[in-house]
Amino acid sequence: MENLLAATNNSVKYMERRKFITTTLKASTALTLMNVPAMVKAAGILNSDLTIQNIIDLILKEIPEAPFKETVDTIKSGNAANKVTGIVTTMFATVDVIREAIKLKANFIIAHEPTFYNHLDDVKWVENNKVVAQKQELLAKNNITVWRFHDYWHTYKPDGIFYGVIKKLDWQNYLRPDKGITLPATTLKNIILHLKSKLGIAHVRVIGDLSKTCKKIALMPGAAGGNIQVSIAEKFTPDLLIVGELQEWETAEYIRDAGLLGNNISLIVLGHTESEEP
């Protein structure tokens, strides 16, 4: 019996196929990376002839205007024509995740972020890269196909990553139509404690007075970049900007100076993976 798998950066969790499908079907209206088997079941083609390309095509049917002409969501390793023996979903297709997939006889890894250390997965990004070559060999030797699921997932309505984080934080009722968040008034410290508890984060980075009251929140998982982060801060004037990752000399210094100039804005940096993995 095949396994359908859900992998994190540090571990792989798995369930027997039928149990997994039953569980995910209950949440099929809120499409997540874990819902791939739910879509397969719904399409009525769950059988031994299912190929990797079949899985990809099913996912793309759920994405507005897919397939895109330009996207990083491409095959990074392997052959999409291969029959599926098992599926791993993960933030990063790390060597640990690949080895777990091998042990579990899963030949298809769906990763949200790059496999070869740069946004375009250009394996010639650094010439004669020994680590890239070793990773390629590990994947090829075990006939594992890696496909990135990034642009499509962020294009899904609502954005799959953003919705997942909002749901994990129990902030659905505070979400505004413009994607801003209006919380009951609370302190920056209390929000930090809530984030750490709900997301399982040991440490966050903060700029701001921990006793300051916050209501209006801008949540930006991942690494949108300094220009977009600062633009959101300027446009929506939130009390608190929560981001996944940033350039320290861009957004962080902007927030620091904004506060020193009397503007009521604080910053929390969660970490890229921590902000998107839920």
PLM segments and residue spans:
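N-terminal secretory signal peptides
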Residues: M1-K19
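Active-site catalytic microenvironments in core metabolic enzymes, especially phosphate/sugar-handling
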Residues: E16-P278
